[in-house]
Amino acid sequence: MLIGVPLETAAGETRVAVTPETVKKLKAQGHVLRVQSGAGVAASATDEAYVAAGAEIVDRAAALGADLVLKVRAPLADELSLMKPGGVLVGMLNPFDRDGLQRLAGAKLTAFALEAAPRTTRAALIVPAAVISIGNRRWYLSAAIITAL
């Protein structure tokens, strides 16, 4: 799967959705990773570290145009316009923001809101879960899905 990691654009945001260590793990599973140039700088991860881990360094449009886009924060309207209809978005999407949800629905994405996913062992047993690493934390993705058809 083609996975994109864009630079976070929210003021003061210093996190990145995928570290070079995570790139190695995803690459070992056969995924192709495209990281926007400078995406990890605020989190002390250089473009060179991403390349050494197996990622391609790309521009904003290429990172946002991937099949699966991993972000820390919800995308801005101009970022949504660069995302692939039918693609998947994973991140902290602020599911209580009605306007944001309307924009997501309009973009025709399947979106996983990490802050809405259960973090209990029991929930992980009930609903199949995948683990995504954001920085040094592990978040569980499950049925907290916003799907726009």
What feature does the model see in each segment?
Residues 5, 70-71, 90-91:
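Redox-cofactor binding/interface segments in oxidoreductases and associated redox assembly factors
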Residues 2, 77, 81-144:
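Glycine/serine-rich phosphate-binding loop and adjoining beta1-alpha1 elements at the start
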Residues 11-20:
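Glycine- and acidic-residue-enriched helix-capping/strand-helix junction motifs
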Residues 146-148:
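Alpha-helix boundary/capping motif
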Residues 54-65:
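Short acidic low-complexity segments
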Residues 4, 25-42:
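Short internal beta-strands
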Residues 34-56:
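N-terminal beta-loop-helix "entrance" segment that forms/cooperates
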